[in-house]
Amino acid sequence: MKQPVELPEINENGYYEIRLESIGGLGANLCGKLLGELGALYLGLNSASFSSYGSEKRGSPVKAYIRWCGEDREVRVNSPVTNPHILGLFHEAMAGKLPVTAGFTETSKVVINSDASPKEIRQRLKLHGGWVYCVDALKIAMESKSRINMVMLGAIVKAAGFIPLEPVEMLVKDTLGKKYPDLLEKNLEGVRRGYEEVRHEAFKPDGKFEEVPYKEPENEWGYENAPIGGVNIRFGSTVSNDLSPSREGYIPLFIQDKCINCGLCDSTCPDMVFQFKPGTYRGKEAMVNCGLDYHHCKGCLRCVDVCCLLYTSRCV
């Protein structure tokens, strides 16, 4: 059942736009799809949503874009959202490493997964002005046994200010409820708590920080200006990537005294976080497992599942 709404503001092209910035594994892609369906099927709007990401795995950058407009207008733009009315940040650790706030203006609203206050977040993100909405989505997701994207969905709907909670609950029931009926109530609790527990504060431009214009990401070196004969051996590599933001509240805890050095954990780890060095095991020379490099561990817990003696355990 539709509950038609009127968009409070639109840009020069007639659209209300949302951009989600996330890391693979936190559910921004699904959240973007749900927001697209919400506008088209439940709010009486024309809607478009699409995502942009590289390798389809946890830890890689993900962007999702949503456009809404009235039923009297068609969505004819499919380019990235450059100046969002709402910006959703699924992890605060992304700030500073990626230009996630590019295109954010003094009239925009940012919804961020963080336990910090809006004032602290404004300082960390170096925002020129605008509205800051903070919700501890990780904590709520762990307590409700839901997912971060469900909590963020509720918080984004609350930040919009013109969307009732009822059509959002109906959307979750009609989509996720049919696919995962056992998790329906947990997901609904996550949406409700995100809607109710988000905190916000408005900041006027005070000259502390400059507005960051949007521009497409590009490498400093390309085929036109790269040194002749030069080779960038780290191009496209994750050697410097901090994957800790993609965790969802748990990390594997390595118990070295009980490890039998079978190497199954190293075989299943997608990011090769286990470190080995020459040593002795049971009186013989062997490559000994020294544990994890948590800088590259994204908390997928595959090592916990594959450990033959279950000597790698979950740790909150």
Named regions from a protein language model:
Residues 311-316:
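Conserved small/polar residues in nucleotide/adenosyl-binding loops
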Residues 16, 250-252, 288:
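Short amphipathic alpha-helical segments
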Residues 27, 56-57, 261, 276, ...:
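Flexible loop/turn segments at secondary-structure boundaries
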Residues 1-230, 234-239, 257:
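Active-site cofactor/cluster-binding pocket
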Residues 45-46, 131, 265, 275, ...:
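Residue-level detector of anion-binding/catalytic polar loops
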Residues 253-272, 291-309:
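Cysteine-centered iron-sulfur cluster-binding motifs in ferredoxin-type domains/subunits
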Residues 151, 170-174, 241-242, 247-248, ...:
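Ferredoxin-type iron-sulfur electron-transfer modules in oxidoreductases and energy-metabolism complexes
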